[in-house]
Structure formats: C-alpha cells, structure tokens
Amino acid sequence: MGLIDFLRNKTKTAETAKNRLQIIIAQERTQRGGPDYLPLLQRELLEVIKKYVKIDADAVKVDLIKDGANDVLDISVALPDDSER
C-alpha cells in the first residue's frame, strides 16, 4: 500500500504551478511598490493629452509616492514649445 498511497497523495502539478505563480506575482507587486493600474493610467492620460497637443510617449510620467500614511499620485507632463503645438 505504500506505493499506492505515495502516488495518490501527490500534489497536482497544476496546483503547484498556480501556487508558485501567485507567490511570484505577489513578490513583483511588493517590489514595484505601485498598484497595477499606473501603466494603464499613464497610457490613457497620454491618449487624452494627444487629442489637444502633439507630444511624445515618454512625455507623461505617473508615479505613486508614499508619504507617511498618505499616497500621492505625481503626474508630470512635459509639454512642447509653442512652435511645436
């Protein structure tokens, strides 16, 4: 019976892979320090600004700054000179 019990009690590989992936995702989120929506927010802000002003993709920067108990959303937009608009 020892061999049958050994084979029967095995953790499924899909479950193991899922658990490992969840750990990796949690570690990456804590290392980044920011929520997942920041890249999407940056792209959407860029699209809205492009409707009115011609700017490059790297002209919009979005950062989340932790200031004690508060989170501050820092949005920086580098606008072109008047001649380039």
UniProtKB/Swiss-Prot annotation:
A Pfam family annotated for this UniProt entry: MinE
Keyword Cell division appears in the UniProt entry: yes
This protein's record includes keyword Cell membrane: no
Origin: domain of life: Bacteria
UniProt KW keywords: Cell cycle, Cell division
GO biological process, one term: cell division
Family classification: Belongs to the MinE family.
Function comment: Prevents the cell division inhibition by proteins MinC and MinD at internal division sites while permitting inhibition at polar sites. This ensures cell division at the proper site by restricting the formation of a division septum at the midpoint of the long axis of the cell.
NCBIfam families listed in its UniProt record: minE (TIGR01215), PRK00296.1 (NF001422)
Name by which UniProt lists this protein: Cell division topological specificity factor
Gene: minE
